[in-house]
Amino acid sequence: MTKKRKFLTILVLGMITAIGPFSIDMYLPAFADIAADLHTTVGHVSLSLSSFFIGISLGQFIYGPMLDRFGRKKPLFAGLFIYLAASAMCALAQSADMLIALRFLQALGGCAGMVASRAMVRDIFSVEDNAKVFSMLMLVVGISPIIAPTLGSLVTVELGWHYIFVILAIMALIIVLAIHFGLPESREADPDYSLKPAAIFRNFGLVIKEPQFYTYAFTGAAAAAGLYAYIAGSPAVFLQIFKVSEHQYGLIFALVAGGLIIATQLNRLLLRTYKSEQIIPVALCMQSVAGISLFVGSLTGWIGLAGTIILLLMFLSCQGFTFPNSSALSMAPFAKNAGSASALMGAVQMSLGAVSSGLVSVFSNGTALPMTAVMACCAIISLIILYFGKRMIRYKASDH
């Protein structure tokens, strides 16, 4: 693959990856406006975030087998058109419950891009390069919180929150065109791949039984669940508790995301010297320290706005190390069932994300405690999973 082709491929994969983060981050600054317009509370509106996570979690079980059976592009196109239509309908939502339902449908379509992009990385690039490519794609996850909330707040002020979803629909159309013209099919259709329920469950079973998969998929998902808790809780924490403006909230969100961007690029440099297996535990320890400090600080009241931002910056920067490395290690054992492996990994991540964001919403009490408590628990749980999972990997290796 030439450098130009590699750059173009990663660029288009990055655009596909952007669907999820933009769908989440862009409408966060509009929570208060949406709540006022639909005559409900910010907490009720935040359930549309949980429904989005649930839709992504369930949808990935559909697209994983389809990507292995029909190739990567056809199921991807189908999902993006569902996403486009649902985005347009979200713009017309007349109630919070309608928005929650439509966000679920939007996620069912958009998750095709998340599953396909991971599977295509496994198809196109060598196992050794996967972590580096995932680090580059993680740039999108880092950049989107800088661009999306700022754009979302601007659109909300100038045009109204409905137009956020119009822009998301237009973005989906642009991505469809980019895939059609700029991304070759990475895996041809496999007529022998069965879509019968028994065969699908058997393939998923083969994936989930692999110790390397469940160790790093669940470790990465638990760590990422802390990020989703932050996403769900940060509007209330900054807008209502610290009383910052929507514009200031967008700037804070962008500042914290900047740490994630720097970390992803530092991870690429570290991979020249260290293995992914060596980087992950160090990052998780740092994330746990930041999470516990946030919780204790919010419980005792000894940290203010500046301290909260600094600790959030530390916590979320660790995602730049854990996500690309855990993704690469989870996908490494699979070539034939890359679609199913990608679906399972994404479903685990989004399921835990739905749980963590849901817990923050349900236990919302006007303080930062629900968000910080969930974030701290996620970091600690990820360390526990990694410890016991690595023992299972060593046990399997000793059997052979």
Go through each PLM region and give its residues.
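Helix-breaking motifs and short loop linkers at transmembrane-helix boundaries and internal kinks
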Residues: 39, 71, 92-98, 109, ...
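Structural signature of the two symmetry-related core transmembrane helices
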Residues: 74-89, 278-294
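Paired small-residue
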Residues: 82-89, 97-105, 306-312
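Cytoplasmic helix-loop-helix junction between adjacent transmembrane helices
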Residues: 102-143
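Flexible cytoplasmic inter-helical loops of multi-pass small-molecule transporters
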Residues: 180-205
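A late C-terminal transmembrane helix in Major Facilitator Superfamily
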Residues: 329-367, 374-375
